[in-house]
Amino acid sequence: MGGDGTLLGVGRKSAPYGTPILGINLGTLGFLTAEEKNHAEYAIDKVLAGDYKMEKRMMLQATIATDMERIEGILALNDICITRGLLYKILEFNIYVNEEYVDTLRADGVIICTPTGSTAYNLSAGGPVLKADAQIIAITPISAHTLTSRSIVVSADDVVTVEINPREEADFTVSADGQDAW
């Protein structure tokens, strides 16, 4: 019970166990939750009676690798974002898909999102809305410093690598669903 933020956090924590989630909205938006709080008892009764439809949503798994450390197993239901830190310096990203160079972006950040996350930060950054059950990922620049930088859509089976230009002293943050950050 909670809002979309609660559901995102529970989704990341329960994903390794394959535990289904029933979201009851107590927050303000409730885009991801199945029911409103005034229908909670009814929704729970339906689930207990076996009268429900389960939606499977894809998740992202990320690894952060720097010269200093390697953090693996980062999960996200909505998105993984790499954004500039406290310094107001634009970042330069090299984007690779399956180890093949795709593009260089100069931007405030980059969003890698699932179809679930495509209607969140990705949409606000001008990215595409993806069909909820599609097995695809969008890569969207945040405030790109060029007119030609646009979102890239790839298969969920593809491995996306974002490399921050090593020539820069980059101050950046990596976040999962806007909640956990490194």
Feature annotation, model-predicted:
Residues E69, I82, N98-Y101, S149-W182:
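ATP/nucleoside-binding phosphotransfer catalytic cores, i.e., glycine-rich phosphate-binding loops
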Residues T104-A107, I112-T148:
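Gly/Ser/Thr-rich active-site loops/lids in small-molecule metabolic enzymes
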